[in-house]
Every structure is written in C-alpha cells, then in structure tokens.
Amino acid sequence: MKITVLGAGSWGTTLAVLLAGKGASVRLWAHRPEFARELEASHENVRYLPGVTIPDSIRIEDDIVRAVQGASIIVTAVPSQALRETLALFRDVSLSDTIIVNVAKGIELDTGKRLSEVIPEVLPAVSPAQVAVLYGPSHAEEVSDKQPTTVVAASSCLETAEKVQEAFHTSMFRVYVNTDIIGVEIAGSVKNIIAIAAGISDGIGYGDNAKAAIITRGLAEMSRLAVSLGGEPMTVSGLSGIGDLVVTCLSRHSRNRYLGEQIGKGRSLEEVISHMNMVAEGVSTTKAVFSLSSRLGVDMPITSAVYEMLFENKPAEQAILDLMTREPKKELGY
C-alpha cells in the first residue's frame, strides 16, 4: 500500500515511521526543500522528533504533487490553518480512489468549518465518504517510543474508517472506528482550548480541584457544541473526547497546556508563541470556536474565558473569578 504523509512535524514523522514499520510504501512530504534535504541526509527529525530514526524505506519529498500521486491514503499532518492552502497545491491530481486522513485538530478560522469539511471543498474529486480523521490521546513522543496508545478513526463512511483502522493498527497502536466524524472532530478540537485553561490554572498555582473542574466542565462544553452541530453526545465520552482531554490537560508533552501555564504565570501570548517551535492549535481554535459558539448560541463559558485571556488581555485570576461567580446552574443538561 502506498501512503503519503503531508507534514514532517513530530506527528507526521511519527505516523510515517509507524506505517513504514507495517510494510507500507511511505512518502513523507516536507514543506521546505531545505528541511526535506536535512531529513534525507540525517535520517532523523532533529527539530521536532529528536532521537527517532527515519528508516531508509521512507521516501522524503519536497514536491507535493509527486508525493501524492498514486497514493492509496494521504495523511494530512499540517497545522489546521494551513490545511486549505496545502490541499490546493494538488487539487488537480486524480484522487477518485484515495482516502484522505486528517490528523490535525482544529476548526478553520475564516469559515468555522471542520477540517473534514474543508477537504472535499478544496479537492473536488474527493467525496465526504473518502475523508476520515485519526484522533485520540496520542503524543508523538510516546507513540514513537512504541508505548501503548489507542485512537479512533472516524468517517461518515464505515468502510473508509475500517480501511484506516487496518492501515494504522499495530500491537501498540490500537485503532477503533466511529462514524460520528462530527463529534470526534469537535471533541478533538475543543480539548485544546480546555487544555489551555488547565495550563492557566497550573500557572496561577491552583491545585487538583481546579484542574478537575476545568476538565469536567470543559467536557460539558465539548458535548454541547458537538450536539448542536449534529454530533452524538456519547462520542465525547470516547477517545477523541475525554481520552484526549485528560492527556492534553495533564501531560508535560502538551503544547496547549504549556502555553496556558505560561499565560497563567503572566507572560503575554505573543511572548509565549515566539519561544515555541511547534504550533499550539488551541490558540486559533479558541478564536474559531468562540465565534462559532456565539453564532450558534451555545453556552461555552470556559472557552469564552480563554478567549478573553488570550485576545482581550483579561487577567487570568479575574477570568477564573468571573467563571466561579456566574449564576448557579444545574449540573447536567444542554
């Protein structure tokens, strides 16, 4: 099977190595030609995944059209806000039988669309039934170290989800399937916002009670938005929801939690981003989801608080106080 991975960051590299280990013919596309040459020469992604060997069997590409031609599966592992422009680079390639698997988590900022909606919009030869996402609690560092990991392949077409499951499943990378792609995508995207909130709590110096409250009430926000868009409420109880939410809010590997922690310590958003070498998807997702939830009339107070802290310079402790002093409500219900 020929599989192309677009994006040579930590996650794209990890998945390329995993797929090559299963015997697939893998091409890994890097956006910058000089970076592609660096990967090819060193057989290691020193910038984003140091210590992991890229096997000789993986073909490094800097020409995206050449990279995707003839692929049975194309994995998009580029930042969410770069997806549309990346897809446009090969929109004229014949893809009638190709499955597109998106692994980036986010909502498109300008349109409020899920990334699985963007793909067939940009690639006219690709139907929604050919599109899948692969989400779940899966830090690249642990997957590349062959630590046990479980994820979910979601598509509106069960057959597509099952093909993705077959392509990626290993003894240490267990893949489940789900046809609720809406719920899976919303859960996987909103969790990055909640992780920023959890990090802010850490940065202020709050303890376990506050973190548990953020995770639990964040799950409620995730569910409300997913259901309002046609997703299933049970999906947020799965791997893309509570699974990814817990790991992202607690892990030292989480970029979004780290960014929030620095905000909680009083650093500006611009300062924190300038010192990060990888994208924290939660920043753009906060802006996109804040706009989307406002338009839909979905109550998402934690998301709103994170938006105010990131983009309106609201002091973190004041934002937390405002959350705590809102009108008392019932715990359950939408």
Swiss-Prot record:
Q: Does the keyword Ion transport apply?
A: no
Taking the first listed entry, what is the main subcellular location of this protein, grouped into a coarse class?
cytoplasm
**A Gene Ontology cellular-component term:** cytosol
Q: So which domain of life are we looking at? A: Bacteria
The main enzyme category here is: oxidoreductase
Q: Which SUPFAM superfamilies match?
A: 6-phosphogluconate dehydrogenase C-terminal domain-like, NAD(P)-binding Rossmann-fold domains
Sites where the protein binds sn-glycerol 3-phosphate: K105, G136, S138, K191, D244, S254, R255, N256
One Gene Ontology term of the biological-process aspect is: glycerophospholipid metabolic process
EC number(s) per entry: 1.1.1.94
Q: Where is the active site?
A: K191 (proton acceptor)
Which residues are noted in the entry as NADPH-binding? S10, W11, H31, R32, K105, A140, R255, V279, E281
Catalytic activity, reaction form: sn-glycerol 3-phosphate + NAD(+) = dihydroxyacetone phosphate + NADH + H(+); sn-glycerol 3-phosphate + NADP(+) = dihydroxyacetone phosphate + NADPH + H(+)
User: Which compartment or compartments is the protein found in?
Assistant: Cytoplasm
Q: Which Pfam families match?
A: NAD_Gly3P_dh_C, NAD_Gly3P_dh_N
Pathway membership: Membrane lipid metabolism; glycerophospholipid metabolism
Single GO molecular-function term?
glycerol-3-phosphate dehydrogenase [NAD(P)+] activity
Tell me which UniProt keywords the record has, alphabetically.
Cytoplasm, Lipid biosynthesis, Lipid metabolism, NAD, NADP, Nucleotide-binding, Oxidoreductase, Phospholipid biosynthesis, Phospholipid metabolism
* Protein family per UniProt: Belongs to the NAD-dependent glycerol-3-phosphate dehydrogenase family.
Looking up PANTHER family in the UniProt record yields:
GLYCEROL-3-PHOSPHATE DEHYDROGENASE, GLYCEROL-3-PHOSPHATE DEHYDROGENASE [NAD(+)] 2, CHLOROPLASTIC
Q: What function is annotated for this protein?
A: Catalyzes the reduction of the glycolytic intermediate dihydroxyacetone phosphate (DHAP) to sn-glycerol 3-phosphate (G3P), the key precursor for phospholipid synthesis.
This protein is called: Glycerol-3-phosphate dehydrogenase [NAD(P)+]
